[in-house]
């Protein structure tokens, strides 16, 4: 999309003294459809509306020094009073604010219904995503249970569902696998030690001095990463550095999730085929995994393959029906739970594990394991991994909470959301859990089934508690291929983003490129590197946009004080001898040369004019030998007898957000070059920040502050008045464009 179609309107305050009511209530412009510039010129004898200078008095800045500022801040934040203590407690525990006001009659039915449905959906997904995180199934149930309870206490969003999220599970799984390899564990060390660990004992590996087996060490790594990620999130909330999420644009997050979805799909392929393959990590793991899959395709377990196909044939159409008829269905069909129950019964009574060597979930213990402190020795190894995990987690949580709050007309506190998601990771990390965040799919289900408040999270937790205390062992015979299918089917939303690309391309090609770069790097390199590449590329695109910004000459809309781009609109009026130039970007060291070249190209190049004058003077010298004083006299005569048509350049600064020292120096240089050939430079519509920069940078002297105007129209009127006062003859028809 060209910037001309989005040019800003520069509307100056009309002269109230004139009482002019002749302006039309609406301004109609016709977009320029042709390559040639079509505009009208004022006649030379036209009179500009009477010129009156706009004067605005600036607010006086307080002279508070740094010491006084610090003292005031400390007094404000460090005072202890009953009222302040109460506000702090209520702010940290939002449940104490809204729960006493809970409307039981109005909200209870919707909250219970949505909580039940989300809980039913979470049971199979929690078990399935545990495999993605490299953990035993019970740990996924723990994670969803504790996250639901803690967010109920600390969260400010009424609608988001906090629990396991596929992309974070993938990132946890990659870290866990790497640490398992570093510790010397391999696929052979997968003894079912959950029952032993749950009884408080440890298992000694016969080949080493390890204090626990592979699954025990895996959750140790996962809980340590989760603890550090939670600490990062709480620290970001405490220091109010949520601005980090600003660098994660919607295009970047969408591309990252889509790229990670390919990695998730790839990691689940071995379960669908029943292959016993090592999990690959690092750069290019997606390609390496598929190479391993095709090399071992002849070892496919037909029982697992048939089960996977049958589950896909049931899950995909039903999920599509749920989505297509969600407005007519009171609640989505819990097809995942139906498939899990049916597959578990078929596997148990058909003895698929014993007869066909089908891989199953295995023993899932009931109850809760004793809390355990994260492994401090692992912190140096996983601290860097936790940075990306924490940023993705809070960015998705905050963006979803703000989106649904806006939709339903209430507000959320971004910092409190960071506290909430941080403690949803810190506290559960002591109870054998891994990282959580909000998830869009479950949040949409929660909203569509009548959720009103955070109380629905308690109902979800009760459903999970029932499974943990009673039902969990019944999933012993559940095939892992079924869990893999559930994981893959839930990737539909992320993979459908490809359908949005044509629309995204028509809106912003730059965002589309960011999406592709982030998606490809996340899929082909790794999730962490993909996120880093996406952030760096987004920042590069921002710099690129300001390095080569759009600029244009402006014309006056007839019978108004509105100025628009002559290259975008037709029938705009151009005042002879005055060029109005708009630069759509901050003016700083990166784009200063672009500013000068665009200005010189679209108006007149003062350097070329001075060179032409010098050449003309030299020709005069060759024709007639004169003294040095004579040369100066001849040049002065030459200049006075060949006046330029262009006498004023007005720079519209409305789109210039800020200036740096290089930008101020560039404006000084431009002004000096133009004044050398008799053209005055005026600045219009400078915001207060730009005005302060110009004043501090000594762009003009105190008596020259009249060269800064509050509107483009005011600057144009001033230029005409000053030209008429000087009595300069302005010839018509002379073009000075340097094109």
Curated annotation (Swiss-Prot):
The keyword Transmembrane applies. Residues 1-27 are annotated as: Disordered. The keyword Transport applies. InterPro entries: S04_transporter_CS (IPR018045), SLC26A/SulP_dom (IPR011547), SLC26A/SulP_fam (IPR001902), STAS_dom (IPR002645), STAS_dom_sf (IPR036513). Residues 568-719 form the STAS domain. It catalyses: oxalate(in) + sulfate(out) = oxalate(out) + sulfate(in); sulfate(out) + 2 chloride(in) = sulfate(in) + 2 chloride(out); oxalate(out) + 2 chloride(in) = oxalate(in) + 2 chloride(out); bromide(in) + chloride(out) = bromide(out) + chloride(in). Glycans are attached at residues 199, 205, 357. One of its GO terms (biological process) is chondrocyte differentiation. N-glycosylated. Its main location: membrane. An extracellular acidic pH inhibits chloride-sulfate and chloride-oxalate exchange activity whereas an intracellular acidic pH activates chloride-sulfate exchange with no effect on chloride-oxalate exchange activity. It is a multi-pass membrane protein. Changing residue 653 to S: In EDM4; no effect on sulfate transport and cell membrane localization. CDD domains: STAS. The chain crosses the membrane at residues 112-132, 137-157, 219-239, 242-262, 378-398, 420-440, 455-475, 524-544. The modification Phosphoserine is found at residues 12, 16. It is found in: Cell membrane; Apical cell membrane. Changing residue 425 to D: In ACG1B; significant loss of sulfate transport. It holds the Pfam family STAS. Keywords: Cell membrane, Disease variant, Dwarfism, Glycoprotein, Membrane, Phosphoprotein, Transmembrane, Transmembrane helix, Transport. One of its GO terms (cellular component) is extracellular exosome. Ubiquitously expressed. It is linked to Diastrophic dysplasia: An autosomal recessive disease characterized by osteochondrodysplasia with clinical features including dwarfism, spinal deformation, and specific joint abnormalities. This is Sulfate transporter. It comes from Homo sapiens (Human).
């Amino acid at each position: 999309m060209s910037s001309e179609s989005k040019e800003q309107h520069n509307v100056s305050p009309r002269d109230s003294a004139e009482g002019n009511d002749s302006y039309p209530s609406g301004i109609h412009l016709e977009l320029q459809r042709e390559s040639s510039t079509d505009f009208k010129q004022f006649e030379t004898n036209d009179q500009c509306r009477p010129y009156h200078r706009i004067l605005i008095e600036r607010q006086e800045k307080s002279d508070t020094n740094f010491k006084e500022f610090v003292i005031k801040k400390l007094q404000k934040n460090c005072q202890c009073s009953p009222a302040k203590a109460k506000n702090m407690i209520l702010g940290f525990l939002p449940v104490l604010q809204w729960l006493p006001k809970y409307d039981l009659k109005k909200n209870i039915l919707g909250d219970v219904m949505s909580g039940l449905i989300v809980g039913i959906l979470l049971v199979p997904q929690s078990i399935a995503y545990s495999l993605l995180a490299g953990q035993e199934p019970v740990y996924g149930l723990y994670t969803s249970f504790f996250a639901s309870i803690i967010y109920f206490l600390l969260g400010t969003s009424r609608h988001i569902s906090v629990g396991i999220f596929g992309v974070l599970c993938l990132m946890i799984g990659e870290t866990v696998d790497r640490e398992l390899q570093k510790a010397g564990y391999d696929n052979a060390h997968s003894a079912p030690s959950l029952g032993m660990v749950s009884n408080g004992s440890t298992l000694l590996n016969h080949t080493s001095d390890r204090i626990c087996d592979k699954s025990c060490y895996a959750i140790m790594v996962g809980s340590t990463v989760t603890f550090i990620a939670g600490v990062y999130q709480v620290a970001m909330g405490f220091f109010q550095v949520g601005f980090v999420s600003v660098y994660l644009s919607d295009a970047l997050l969408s591309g990252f999730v889509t790229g990670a979805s390919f990695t998730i799909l790839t990691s689940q392929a071995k379960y669908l085929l029943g292959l016993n393959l090592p999990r690959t990590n690092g750069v290019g793991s997606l390609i390496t995994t598929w190479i391993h899959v095709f090399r071992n395709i002849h070892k496919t377990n037909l029982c697992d393959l048939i089960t996977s196909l049958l589950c896909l044939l049931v899950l995909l159409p039903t999920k599509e029906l749920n989505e297509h008829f969600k407005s007519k269905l009171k609640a989505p069909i819990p097809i995942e739970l139906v498939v899990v129950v049916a597959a578990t019964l078929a596997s148990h009574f058909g003895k698929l594990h014993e007869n066909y060597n089908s891989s199953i979930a295995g023993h899932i213990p009931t109850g809760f394991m004793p809390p355990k402190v994260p492994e401090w020795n692992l912190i140096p190894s996983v601290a860097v991994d936790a940075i990306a995990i924490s940023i993705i987690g809070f960015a998705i949580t905050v963006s979803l909470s703000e989106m649904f709050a806006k939709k339903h007309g209430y507000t959320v506190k971004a910092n409190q959301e960071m506290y909430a998601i941080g403690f949803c990771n810190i506290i559960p990390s002591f109870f054998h859990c891994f990282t959580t965040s909000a998830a869009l799919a479950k949040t949409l289900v929660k909203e569509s089934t009548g959720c009103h408040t955070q109380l629905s999270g308690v109902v979800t937790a009760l459903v999970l508690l029932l499974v943990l205390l009673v039902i969990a062992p019944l999933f012993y015979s559940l095939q892992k291929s079924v869990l893999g299918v559930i994981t893959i089917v839930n990737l539909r939303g992320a993979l459908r983003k490809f359908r949005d690309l044509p629309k995204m391309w028509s809106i912003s090609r730059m965002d589309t490129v960011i999406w592709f770069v982030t998606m490809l790097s996340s899929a082909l390199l790794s999730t962490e590197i993909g996120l880093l590449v996406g952030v760096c590329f987004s920042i590069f695109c921002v710099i690129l946009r300001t390095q080569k910004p759009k600029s244009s000459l402006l014309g006056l809309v007839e019978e108004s004080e509105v100025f628009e781009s002559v290259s975008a609109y037709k029938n705009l009026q151009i005042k002879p001898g005055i060029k109005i130039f708009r630069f759509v970007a901050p003016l700083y060291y990166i784009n200063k040369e672009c500013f000068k070249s665009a200005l010189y190209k679209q108006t007149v190049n003062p350097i070329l004019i001075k060179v032409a004058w010098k050449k003309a003077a030299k020709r005069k010298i060759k024709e007639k030998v004169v003294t040095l004083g004579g040369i100066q006299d001849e040049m002065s005569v030459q200049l006075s007898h060949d006046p330029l048509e262009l006498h004023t350049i007005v720079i519209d600064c409305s789109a210039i957000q800020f200036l740096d020292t290089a930008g101020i120096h560039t404006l000084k240089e431009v002004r000096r070059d133009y004044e050398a050939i008799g053209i005055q430079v005026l600045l219009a519509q400078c915001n207060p920040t730009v005005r302060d920069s110009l004043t501090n940078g000594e762009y003009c002297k105190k008596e020259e502050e009249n060269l800064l105007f509050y509107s483009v129209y005011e600057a144009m009127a001033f230029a005409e008045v000053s030209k008429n006062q000087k009595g300069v003859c302005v010839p018509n028809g002379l073009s000075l464009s340097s094109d």
